[in-house]
Amino acid sequence: MADDGPIIEEIAEKNGRVARIMQRLQHDTQRVTSVPGFNTSATGYADLIALLDQYKNDLEAVGFNDLEQARRRAPSVDITVGSNSTNLVDYSHGRHDMPSHRRHDSSDEEITAANSHHQSPINVGNRNDTDGTNGRNGSRAGSSSSDRVRMIAGRNRISKTRRYRPGQKALEEIRKYQESEDLLIPKAPFARLVREIMQTSTPFSSDLRIRSDAINALQEASEALLVQMFDGSSLISAHSKRATLTTTDVQLYRRLCLPNL
């Protein structure tokens, strides 16, 4: 009967070689790290790195030798016995039908898989330290977007909404309008209102034109009338011991001071 795998002696020999290499690695590591001042000297770190690289190559060589021995035993396997004959036909057709570059890639994948199976504990530790769950990279990947503070460009602190005391905003607006000389009503809407009133109140409005100076004069007079009316209405509301201006105050002011309107 054909031999399909390594025998017991080879497995024991391989485990013995790996154990001897690990013992030498432990002994040499203790020898390097036991030197006084090892943590503060660059030479000690360099010796330790060189030592790890050396034993890494030794462990990889052990795995490569096992792979070569498995390849040498492969021709002695009788694959024509039983159901293996069909596998032989399928395998031969698959290899011949496959392009040459794919055949080389598959061989490389087999070598890579074998090397990764016999990888040393040193490489396994390094790979675990660099994944997304441990070390610096782990802390960086674990931080969520909600933990980050988004700063506004050009500012050194986070902007906060200003809160005003009751009545402070109104006083600031009153001072702004008192100091400015601009009109309160925009000119374009007021001009449209004047033209609309002219079209509805006069039958021959299509032939009439109004100058911009006349519109400005009407706007000045209208705003002066509104300011005077609201000033008198606020006095009436203050006389009634109320702080809120209502429509009854405006109507009373019109009856008393503006009887013609």
Curated annotation (Swiss-Prot):
Self-association and partners: Forms a nucleosome-like histone octamer containing two molecules each of H2A, H2B, cpar-1 and H4 assembled in one cpar-1-H4 heterotetramer and two H2A-H2B heterodimers.
Biological role stated in the UniProt entry: Histone H3-like variant which exclusively replaces conventional H3 in the nucleosome core of centromeric chromatin at the inner plate of the kinetochore. Required for recruitment and assembly of kinetochore proteins, mitotic progression and chromosome segregation. May serve as an epigenetic mark that propagates centromere identity through replication and cell division. Not required for chromosome segregation during meiosis.
Ranges of Low complexity composition bias in the record: 132-146
Any Gene Ontology CC annotation: nucleus
GO terms of biological process kind: mitotic sister chromatid segregation
Intracellular or extracellular location(s): Nucleus; Chromosome
Ribonucleoprotein recorded as keyword: no
Expression induction: Present at much lower (<5%) level than hcp-3 (at protein level).
Protein family per UniProt: Belongs to the histone H3 family.
SUPFAM superfamilies assigned: Histone-fold
Disulphide bridges, residue numbers: none
Keywords: Chromosome, DNA-binding, Nucleosome core, Nucleus
Annotated GO MF terms: DNA binding; protein heterodimerization activity; structural constituent of chromatin
Name under which the protein is recorded: Histone H3-like centromeric protein cpar-1
UniProt modification remark: Cleaved at the onset of meiotic anaphase I, likely by separase sep-1.
Region (Disordered): 80-150
Predominant cellular place of this UniProt entry's protein: nucleus
The keyword Transit peptide is annotated on this UniProt entry: no
Region H3-like: start-end pairs: 164-261
Residues carrying the site annotation Cleavage: 71-72
Any one Pfam family match given in the protein's UniProt record, by short name: Histone
Entries under InterPro entries matching the protein: Histone-fold (IPR009072), Histone_H2A/H2B/H3 (IPR007125), Histone_H3/CENP-A (IPR000164)
PANTHER family in UniProt: HISTONE H3.2
Compositional bias ranges of the Polar residues kind: 113-127
